[in-house]
Amino acid sequence: MASRAQNRRPAQEVDNTISYVQCDGLAAMKMVKHCHEESRSNMEVAQGALLGLVVDDRLEITNCFPFPKSSDETIDEEEYQLNMMRRLRLVNVDHFHVGWYQSADVGNFLSLPLLESQYHYQTSIEESVVVIYDTQKSARGFLTLKAYRLTPQAIAMYKEEKFTPEALRNLKVGYENLFIEIPIVIKNSALCNIMMSEMKEMVPEEEGTHFLDLGTASVLENHLRCLMDRVDELNQEANKFNKYQQTVIRQEQDKHRMLAKHAQENAARIAKGEAAIPDEEVQKLFRPLPVPSRLNPMIVSGQINTYAQHISQFCSQSLAKLYMTQALQGAKENKQ
């Protein structure tokens, strides 16, 4: 799958609307805090709005606020967002809507709701982005904030609302070119940088032994379970499409037999001097079958590719730790 992604990447159209995203440290901390709070409350995803402004080819994110998580359907989310931006405007905070953010696990954020939401955002706000925060990877010490935009091919696919194999092939759309990643940088004020430099001196130095922790079975097990679930789902989608193709083949065979029989009957009628029956009567009996959507299998394929990449990277790191631990253990035994 990775080689397939590399082969198809050059055909991707380039979106030059935004060159990079600049995020204030305060907005980044708000996103991190919200996502971790929701992950501890067993909520699937945390979502919120991004506020800022566009300067030339730079999108600046200066503030954010979470979306309501109430299950009450009477709450109007659009009205809630408008009220929030109206109140932020009263206190002289940037109130322009420039996108939204969402939490994700092990970087696997690709889903149908996210695609639809970003399409509506990007068609109404051209410069909008979606920022993905990986809670699990950040909890292991790697801050993961990534900004994405839909590619022109993905937008064209949604505009046409055709997810058949022919339509996807003509648009050259695959899971590897649904999104384009936009570089994101975090900017702090000079006073914040000075304070963080002082705090760094106050933090005691770690010995670094926790980096050699080999208790990675739970993480790898979770990755493999998710990968197996996605493979099973993709297998079910493949079976559905195979059944559709078999049904189409049987219908075509029945249609040809009926047309051949109809031609013989017409020949007999003509020989008797009677008028031939038009073929439209037979054509009406065999209406084209609806083509199943290939959007969901494409998304599942992208999820499988993401899990496979994470497992490969994780195993490489674990092997490096294992060799380092083996060398340290050997050195310790030699000293004894």
UniProtKB/Swiss-Prot annotation:
Signal peptide (residue range): none
CDD domains: MPN_eIF3h
Gene Ontology terms: cellular component: eukaryotic 43S preinitiation complex; eukaryotic 48S preinitiation complex; eukaryotic translation initiation factor 3 complex
Domain of life, source organism: Eukaryota
InterPro entries in the record: eIF3h, eIF3h_C, JAMM/MPN+_dom, JAMM_MPN+_peptidase_M67A, MPN
GO terms, molecular function: metallopeptidase activity; translation initiation factor activity
Entry keyword set: Cytoplasm, Initiation factor, Protein biosynthesis
Role of this protein: Component of the eukaryotic translation initiation factor 3 (eIF-3) complex, which is involved in protein synthesis of a specialized repertoire of mRNAs and, together with other initiation factors, stimulates binding of mRNA and methionyl-tRNAi to the 40S ribosome. The eIF-3 complex specifically targets and initiates translation of a subset of mRNAs involved in cell proliferation.
Assigned protein family: Belongs to the eIF-3 subunit H family.
Complex formation: Component of the eukaryotic translation initiation factor 3 (eIF-3) complex.
Protein name, as recorded: Eukaryotic translation initiation factor 3 subunit H
Species this chain originates from: Aedes aegypti (Yellowfever mosquito)
Top-level taxonomy: Eukaryota, Metazoa, Ecdysozoa, Arthropoda, Hexapoda
